[in-house]
């Protein structure tokens, strides 16, 4: 029994081996045939492509002939093109066009602005006479061609007593000076002193001399 079984398995092995050899041979033959066909087909395709390329090059060398259809197509293209619209960015002058020196110069005020600020400019010119506790160098100050007026904003770190109220805030320098009590007292005192000096030796002096003479009699 054992020998018969072994013989059967051996026969099966031989048959399977022979089948594998046949199949491999068939596959090799089929692959060779396919390669031959592919090579043949590739050669044909290369020839066709080369012919087409020659035809294209010859056509490109020929001169162009403009027809009515080309003119119509060009007109349609021109109609479809939208007109260029200038945007706001293009209308605005470029910042690069300005000179670098213009960045550091103040604006030149108009005549109306000069009239409005004329009194303030006079006060700045004679600022040495406004406050006795502040002294300035003697100089011939003139109104510059370019100037600007700004407001001082108090810092939040400052105490409330050092800040100005809404009533104290004025639109001009003259109004702020006239609204200050201390400055008004100083101005009145100086005005009286100047008036006494200017009136000395005139009618007041004559009246005083008359009164003195009457008392002597």
UniProtKB/Swiss-Prot annotation:
The modification N-acetylmethionine is found at residue 1. Keywords: Acetylation, Nucleus, Ribosome biogenesis, rRNA processing. Residues 200-217 have a biased composition (Basic residues). One of its GO terms (biological process) is endonucleolytic cleavage to generate mature 5'-end of SSU-rRNA from (SSU-rRNA, 5.8S rRNA, LSU-rRNA). The keyword rRNA processing applies. It holds the Pfam family Fcf2. Residues 87-101 have a biased composition (Basic and acidic residues). GO terms for cellular component: nucleolus; nucleus. It comes from the Eukaryota. InterPro entries: Fcf2/DNTTIP2, Fcf2_C. Residues 76-111, 193-217 are annotated as: Disordered. It is found in: Nucleus, Nucleolus. Essential protein involved in pre-rRNA processing and 40S ribosomal subunit assembly. Required for the early cleavage steps of 35S rRNA at the A(0), A(1), and A(2) sites. Belongs to the FCF2 family. Interacts with FAF1. This is rRNA-processing protein FCF2.
């Amino acid at each position: 029994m054992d020998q018969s079984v072994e013989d059967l398995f051996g026969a099966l092995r031989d048959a399977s081996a022979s089948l594998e050899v046949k199949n491999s041979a068939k596959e090799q033959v089929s692959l060779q045939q396919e390669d031959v066909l592919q090579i043949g087909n590739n050669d044909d395709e290369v020839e066709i492509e080369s012919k087409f390329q020659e035809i294209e090059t010859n056509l490109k060398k020929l001169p162009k002939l403009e027809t009515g259809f080309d003119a119509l197509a060009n007109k349609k293209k021109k109609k479809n093109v939208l007109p260029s619209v200038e945007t706001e960015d293009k209308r605005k002058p470029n910042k690069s066009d300005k000179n670098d020196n213009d960045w550091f110069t103040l604006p030149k005020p108009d005549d109306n602005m000069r009239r409005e600020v004329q009194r303030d400019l006079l006060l700045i010119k004679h600022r040495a006479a406004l406050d006795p506790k502040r002294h300035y160098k003697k100089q011939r100050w003139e109104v510059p061609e370019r100037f600007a007026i700004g407001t001082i904003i108090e810092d939040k770190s400052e105490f409330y007593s050092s800040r100005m109220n809404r009533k104290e805030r004025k639109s001009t320098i003259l109004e702020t000076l006239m609204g200050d009590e201390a400055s008004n007292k100083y101005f009145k005192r100086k005005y009286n002193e100047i008036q006494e000096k200017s009136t000395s030796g005139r009618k007041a002096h004559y009246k005083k001399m008359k009164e003195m003479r009457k008392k002597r009699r």
